[in-house]
């Protein structure tokens, strides 16, 4: 949702929902936070996105200026974009409609900070003439690792179907390590690296 503090305070549905969740102070906090930012001539990252979107949306002459300036737009890691970023890109593409995005829906791991996977899953709805090029060969991992990853990913209800493969060696079986904390996990992995170096004479590189 893209709401300024003023829009938030005037939205009856939001205020009702906040009251139901016993978080009515959200409105007051947002207003005071916005006031402090304005007094300091400051914006946080969310403000930058929100105000950029509103600037383009509410000022056609500015939107046309920048949409005309950027004839080609490339966005990397599109699976990690949020709602505001998706709308900003849409505003900038209105004139030339030349957009190239790179991304992997199977690597969307930042929803906790606002990333919206539907941006990449539903991209063809926003751009009906979209062409998709699937880069399915993996050059980094063995086929054993790729097969294990595929077996997990194929259960995703919403995804862009891919047949990822590797032409590298089959590779060793994947060991399963059970640990009770991140510290224990790090300890086990570090000791395994030390043991591998001692036994096989392997390099840390």
Per-region residue spans from a language model:
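Upstream accessory/linker segments immediately N-terminal to the RecA-like ATPase cores of bacterial MutS
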Residues: 1-13, 18-27
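Short, glycine- and charge-enriched coil/turn segments that flank and shape catalytic ligand pockets
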Residues: 14-20, 60-61, 129, 198-201
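Short linear capping/connector segments at secondary-structure termini
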Residues: 11-17, 69-71, 105-106, 165-173
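Helicase P-loop NTPase motor core
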Residues: 128-131, 136-205
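Glycine-/small-residue-rich beta-strand-loop submotif within the FAD-binding core of flavoenzymes
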Residues: 125
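Solvent-exposed, flexible loop/coil residues
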Residues: 6, 12, 47-49, 113-116, ...
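Proline-centered turn/helix-capping motifs that create local helix->coil transitions or kinks
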Residues: 1-10, 42, 152-162
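Conserved helicase NTPase motor core
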Residues: 18-122, 134-141
């Amino acid at each position: 949702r893209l709401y300024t503090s003023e829009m938030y305070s005037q939205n009856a549905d939001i205020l009702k929902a906040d009251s139901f969740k016993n978080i009515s102070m959200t409105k007051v906090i947002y207003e005071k936070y916005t006031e402090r930012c304005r007094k300091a001539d400051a914006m946080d990252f969310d403000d930058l996105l929100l105000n950029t979107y509103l600037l383009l949306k509410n000022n056609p002459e500015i939107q046309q200026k920048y949409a005309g300036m950027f004839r080609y737009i490339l966005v990397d890691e599109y699976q990690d974009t949020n709602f505001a970023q998706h709308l900003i890109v849409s505003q900038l593409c209105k004139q030339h409609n030349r957009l190239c995005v790179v991304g992997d829906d199977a690597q969307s791991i930042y929803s906790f900070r606002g990333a919206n996977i539907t941006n990449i899953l539903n991209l063809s709805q926003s751009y009906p003439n979209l062409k998709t090029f699937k880069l399915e060969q993996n050059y980094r991992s063995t086929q054993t690792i790729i097969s294990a990853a595929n077996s997990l990913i194929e259960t995703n209800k919403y995804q862009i179907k891919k047949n990822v493969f590797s032409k590298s060696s089959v590779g060793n079986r994947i060991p399963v390590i059970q640990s009770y904390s991140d510290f224990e996990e790090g300890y086990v992995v570090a000791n395994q690296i030390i043991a591998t170096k001692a036994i096989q004479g392997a390099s840390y590189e």
